[in-house]
Amino acid sequence: MMFKECEVLVVGAGPAGSAAATAAAEGGAETLLIDRKKEIGTPVQCGEVVGETLLKKLNLKLPPGAQAAKLDHTRFMLDRRVQLTSREPYWKAVTLERKIFDKAL
């Protein structure tokens, strides 16, 4: 078993864990990010659609091949009887290839 000292240990290399580890490292903390999976981004669980507004707020640039599709609207569905579609600029989004996106984080 290998031991490594760090100031911040982040468990889980999904988007949230990767973002937390990046923020800690950029803040000067000696950071270690670990994940139980051998390959980051697989198998994909969910969360392939991300709002363009969020990407801009987080100053995230999509790596080549990470954007699968661009969406000009978002549709919220409670069930087949209740649906809400918004084409407001705030709700524009992209569908991600998580295998590529997660590794780039």
What is the predicted role of each segment?
Residues 1-5, 24:
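Extreme N-terminus of proteins, especially the signal/transit-peptide cleavage junction
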Residues 17-18:
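N-terminal Rossmann-fold NAD(P) dinucleotide-binding loop
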Residues 76-105:
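Conserved N-terminal helical subregion
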Residues 64-74, 78-81:
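Glycine-rich active-site loop/strand segments that organize a redox cofactor
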